[in-house]
């Protein structure tokens, strides 16, 4: 007896294959965010250009933290979005949350570089105000934006303000502020030393740990986004530059890990 098989199963197979395949190879309206790097600022990134300004060799290291964000022009495929979704160190955000409509990568990079430059200027102002109050013997008359050299290609945004300030204060004072520690930080800074929130704090905690930092300063405004189960690093939430410096100078080094300074931890 001859058997004749229906073509329907094959058509259904093809239909369902295309049904699942097409979304995977089609662009989706999302942005991918992943941990970036912890970049050490000493001795090459953060430098003082003027030989007339007295500086001291740091005993320790400070790290600028970054995150990796897909660009405004990037086409994220469905398969890439799924791969990100199943990873713990990858986050998806709607494109409209991260970027304005009709913006471009060039525009966003220019904006980020301007924010970085402004954060360096604010850090210098905050440093001078802190030194004037706490180290009056330090001559701050020659300190200015033009005396500072920062070499950070392909990095932008305002979140380096806090760690720039900590690095500069350690540069200009003879006191052993870092005491051999590896300190990371992420937060905006104002001229009067107030520390503001930044984006991607969870990813930056991962970057700090990979860099080998033992302490990470974060804005108290970010507490709601800091994970409860942080391990392997001390995350210290602060509101001002003064609080960060007090912690470094007054709190004994220990092997404690986790989060301090927050009452409302997030996910």
Language-model regions, residue ranges each:
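Peripheral, non-AAA+ core regions of ATP-driven protein-machinery
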Residues: 2-267
